[in-house]
Regions:
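Outer-membrane beta-barrel proteins and related beta-barrel translocases across Gram-negative bacteria
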Residues: 2-208
Length: 208
């Protein structure tokens, strides 16, 4: 634990904490600030990410990851992204969700400002049903409210294993895996969203 701690950027005081502590490698789980990250982008300018890890019990935690930006034309008022990751692990299930929110963003193609956000989620569960050896349920959600969101904020969405593989196509799905003696069955639905296409043509559905 540090007393009267000051965070400086290029010798300029940015934040002051009467008391400051952070996770230690010798401690398995402990709430505290994680290592800050600096970023510089031609599109968004300079920014700093200051993550805070919070334990919520033995099987769940939350990481608050705000990103602060310098004054830039794309931001009408607020100049920060509020990003949060939640994780929960049970005996037969796991959940991880990442959400971010930004107010009054002005894109290069629209003079009006609007609130934008993202939601990435993965849920896995093992089910017990008679006559089946293994049953697994999986759900994934990839959602953004701005078509160029992933391209613009790629370098600012830190440390999320849920970041979509493509910046132009989102994949949300629900799947059920069943295993029986000498038999395997996979069923579900997948939805692909092409961010470069307008209206209903941007969605493609895949069924078993």
């Amino acid at each position: 634990i540090y007393k009267n701690a000051i965070i400086r950027i290029y010798d300029t005081p940015i934040l002051y904490f009467p008391k400051f502590f952070h996770p230690d490698s010798s401690v398995k789980r402990r709430s505290g600030f994680l290592q800050p990250r600096l970023n510089n982008s031609k599109t968004l300018g300079s920014s700093i990410n200051i993550p805070y890890f919070k334990t919520l019990g033995s099987n769940k935690d939350l990481t608050f990851k705000p990103t602060l930006f310098e004054k830039f034309s794309k931001f009408e008022k607020e100049k920060y992204i509020l990003q949060t990751e939640f994780r929960k692990k049970e005996k037969n299930s796991s959940l991880i969700a990442d959400f971010a929110f930004l107010r009054d963003y002005k894109s290069s193609t629209n003079s009006k400002t609007k609130n934008i956000n993202h939601l990435f989620l993965n849920y896995n569960s093992k089910l017990n049903i008679p006559n089946f050896l293994k049953i697994r349920f999986e759900a994934n959600i990839e959602r953004v409210t701005n078509d160029t969101y992933l391209k613009v904020f790629e370098n600012n969405l830190f440390d999320t294993p849920l970041l979509p593989a493509s910046q132009t196509t989102l994949n949300s799905n629900v799947k059920l895996y069943l295993e029986k003696e000498n038999q395997n069955l996979t069923t579900g639905i997948e939805v692909y969203e092409n961010l470069g296409v307008k209206h209903s043509d941007r969605y493609q559905y895949t069924l078993p």
